[in-house]
Each structure stands twice: as C-alpha cells, then as structure tokens.
Amino acid sequence: MFGEPGKGLNKSGFDESAVNLGQEGEINFAKALQKKGLLEKLVTFWSVHNLNLEDERVDADIDCVIVSGSTIWLVDLKFYASGNVIYREENGLLYTIDSATGAQIGRPKKMSPNMSYAEESFSHKFANLLKYYRLETRVVLMPTYKGAGRLDNVFWPGQIKAVSLEEMLDELSREDKFRDTIGGQMIRQTFNLLLKR
C-alpha cells in the first residue's frame, strides 16, 4: 500500500464536510480491500496525481490505483447518500431516488469527466506498459452506515462504469496476484512518483 487514503482531499478546495466524507469513503474502501485479503494480493496507490496530455499534473487526482498481475485499475470513490436508494444518471447528472417513494433525495450531483481524462491520459502516457496490462477505470459508489444503494446502469462521462463496492471487490478478487517483474517494478516506481505528498 503506497500513499495514504484520503490525503489528496486536503488540498482539493472542497469544504470541510465534503473533505471528511471523501476521506471516510477512501478509508472504508481500504478497509474493505484489507478485509478481503486484497491488499496482500494487489498493489495499491492512494491519491495519485492525474496528468494531462502535456505531462503536467492537474488538480484532480485519482483516489486509488490498483495493480494486479494483468490489470491497472483507476478508481474514483464516491461517498454519497445511500441505503434504500436507486442511483440514476440523466444528462450528466446523478440522481438519488428513494426506492420506497420514488422521490428524489437532495440535489442531483454533477458527474465530473475527471476519470475519462485520467483514462485518456494514462492510455497515452503509458502505452508501452499497456502492451502487457489492461487498463480499467471505475467509479465506485461506497455504502454508508445505511447500506448500499442500487445502480440503474450508471456511467460517468466517457462511458466510465459506476459500480457498487461489492461489484468492485468481486472484480478485484478475480484478478491475478501482482507480480514483481520488471514491468511490475516499473509500474510501482511510476505510480510512486505520482503520489500526492
């Protein structure tokens, strides 16, 4: 485990409440990976600088990069209202709907294209590494103490699939163990350099 879950939020410009919620979501994701034994199987990097196509760091970071023996996962974590709710996407906005009443909960959230930019940038910058690794990008809607919401076929801009924590853990559990090959060492060094410090 490289970096610190939630560290990138300290300089994000979000208000204190949003920072605390975001940090809680990232810490809970790390705990879920630990509980499933995935931190021993896979290599994780927390609060990774995103790059633009000119190789410059941009403000938005990647919450977590996870590397298996065959896949690099770029993961964005969302800690929104949950429980007995359904998440729906419409015109770039994420709506939270109460399952029992069908009423909308709170204001819709604008769905950022950051992960689409991250996928494009990393595909471009690390094309040589991606001859040996697949690149997968996910937005994970984390459960709160009220439980997990249900996703109604939600995609973030750039067709980035949104999944529940359970779905993400299931995908990761089917991955090969990280291998400390030359390629694996290159990935570790590269993402280590991109950690927010």
Give residue ranges: language-model regions.
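Surface-exposed interaction regions that form or flank ligand-binding interfaces
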Residues: 1-60, 67-72, 78-88, 93-197
